[in-house]
């Protein structure tokens, strides 16, 4: 009887210990498995720009160069999705809508402009810029930080078979446009995120406007319309435009100014590049191998009105952009992070100036 009781006691102790260890392991496993999990809804929100804390420059670019957003040509679903992604991101980080309680600013296109880069598709006659703002203490002055999000397709002529009614057709090929200008949009968005956090408790001296322009590839249409519609809202403003950055290799930012109105702006920005050790070259933006300027961007829409503007763009882009070579494999994300940090640094330290 005594032996039997001892055996029962030992068995009971073993069972109790087993239950305790099982329970502890279950809790531990539960704790470990719950860490770092992203729910399906969070994944969906991230893919459409609603979850900015899960996004960075690299992941934003991965989205905007993926099949859902590929080429981002004016008038296509990919362009519309890109606009929605940016709007969702602006809203989620706490920017205020700029245009009568809306982040959208409508831009109308004529038929000829709509058909240039996608001749086989019928497109709507309007697109949207996406505009958000951090309101400043003095809303009669502003800095406009901009980047365009539309891109192009490659057009190829394809001969039809002999029995076809048409002998020639244009084949449209979509390309990523990583350098031009998913890079600029990613830096724009992440700069906006950093600055909304920085100015969470105290307003900047003047408005900081974040503008994602559309239809740049059709002739600076989105930015031109923005300047036309809103220039009179401000006594003074200036522009910093981001277009075509982040290529790996030896090319620096092209920071040679070509307009006297903009010289002070360039001088102050170069000081920050020096301080933050961002490599640049004293060459003009969008030059070819023969030093001819063969391209432009949305900063020119501001210069037409005699307002100061600066373009953050890399040298060596001619021949890469608008080709299949412009893809994510040539992107230096550390370089993009350093450019973004320098831009934020410049805006904070020159908060009291309008050029």
What is each stretch, according to the model?
Residues 21-23:
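C-terminal motif of bacterial Sec signal peptides marking the signal peptidase cleavage site
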Residues 43-51, 67-78, 116-121, 170-181, ...:
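Second-shell loop/turn segments in exported
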Residues 52, 56-63, 77-92, 102, ...:
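Extracytoplasmic/secreted proteins, especially bacterial periplasmic and envelope-associated proteins
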Residues 72-134:
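A non-catalytic alpha/beta surface segment that caps or lines the substrate-entry region
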Residues 126, 170-264:
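Acidic/histidine-rich catalytic neighborhood of metal-dependent amide-processing enzymes
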